């Protein structure tokens, strides 16, 4: 058995808590060796209010030297192309598409029915084209509006459009079973079963943070599983402070490390983050915790490079 250092012991104690759970978490860290869980900060950038929010978000990322993926709706990008280019054209950031106008690419129990196949083609192709035109770099990733509880499984026609557009990964698994939240800590997989082994699914995890604060004004809804796989991450009510939100985030960050997940990425929306926490205190708390745990920051594109075998680092 590999000898564990004092530094690893201290880190294990922080992650797992003091007591018997420390030993089980230490054993997990020993078993995984030098493999480190990756962390991806990702933002669904989808509304006019996102531009001001992204200015604040970028400041925090640069201060922490924290990479990020921005999934941008094409219409949102086309409304302020120069401003977004100046703000996000930075080595830390990947820019991917969030479709062109946030229309549904398959049915979603909460967000509505899918548009026609012709409309889905436009959403995929125009969204990718907008990113590549504004940023003059390849766009290899797509996150569909709202996401789904079964990703794009069983949707070969949509996957064919995605392949035709040149998209290499999608991030569409953003809900738990039966459209529940939080989304589970799922690892990447490809669509070989649908006939598309070169297209990878890179899920998102945890809550859609806007729902934690009732920013969609849905009010009380049927959202959680019972019994919950993450009871500590189901608050008694809507979050009231940045610290409340951070405590929820911490559950997923800690669990991903404890269970040896390949990565963890929470589902964030700039407009909602800024409305709730204009000083971005939650980001600072979360990024500090990521660094304390020793998670390995990256972008979705970098994760795709690893899981697809393109990048062996």
Model-derived features with residue positions:
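Active-site-adjacent substrate/metal-binding segments within catalytic domains
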Residues: 41-51
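C-terminal segment of N-terminal export signals and the immediately downstream linker at the start
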Residues: 24-38
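Metal-dependent polysaccharide deacetylase catalytic core of the NodB/CE4 family, i.e.
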Residues: 38, 64-153, 171-180, 196-219, ...
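Active-site-adjacent pocket scaffolds in enzyme catalytic domains
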Residues: 77, 146-259
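N-terminal export signals
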Residues: 2, 8-28
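Generic structural signal for well-ordered alpha-helices
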Residues: 54, 58, 81-85, 121-128, ...
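C-terminal domain-boundary segment and adjacent tail
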Residues: 33, 174, 239, 243-313
């Amino acid at each position: 058995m590999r000898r564990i250092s004092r530094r690893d012991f201290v880190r294990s104690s922080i992650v797992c808590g003091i007591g018997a759970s420390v030993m089980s978490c230490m054993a997990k860290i020993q078993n995984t060796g030098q493999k480190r869980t990756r962390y991806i900060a990702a933002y669904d950038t989808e509304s006019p209010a996102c531009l001001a929010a992204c200015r604040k978000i970028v400041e925090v990322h640069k201060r922490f030297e924290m990479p990020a993926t921005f999934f941008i709706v094409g219409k949102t990008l086309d409304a302020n192309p120069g401003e977004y280019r100046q703000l996000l054209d930075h080595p830390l950031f990947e820019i991917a598409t969030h479709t062109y106008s946030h229309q549904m690419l398959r049915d979603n129990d909460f967000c509505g029915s899918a548009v026609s196949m012709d409309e889905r083609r436009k959403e995929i192709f125009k969204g990718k084209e907008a990113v590549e035109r504004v940023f003059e770099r390849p766009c290899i990733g797509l996150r569909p509006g709202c996401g789904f509880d079964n990703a794009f499984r069983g949707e070969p026609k949509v996957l064919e459009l995605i392949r035709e557009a040149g998209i290499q990964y999608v991030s569409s698994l953003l809900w738990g079973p039966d459209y529940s939240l939080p989304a589970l800590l799922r690892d990447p997989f490809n669509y070989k079963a649908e006939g598309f082994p070169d297209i990878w699914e890179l899920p998102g995890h945890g809550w859609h943070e806007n729902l934690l604060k009732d920013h969609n004004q849905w009010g009380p809804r049927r959202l959680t599983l019972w019994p919950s796989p993450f009871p500590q991450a189901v608050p008694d009510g809507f979050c009231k402070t940045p610290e409340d939100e951070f405590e929820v985030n911490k559950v997923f960050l800690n669990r991903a490390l404890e269970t040896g997940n390949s990565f963890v990425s929470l589902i964030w929306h700039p407009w909602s983050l800024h409305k709730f926490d204009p000083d971005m205190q939650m980001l600072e708390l979360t990024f500090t915790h990521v660094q304390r745990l020793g998670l390995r920051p990256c972008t979705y594109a970098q994760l795709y490079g690893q899981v697809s075998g393109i990048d062996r680092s």
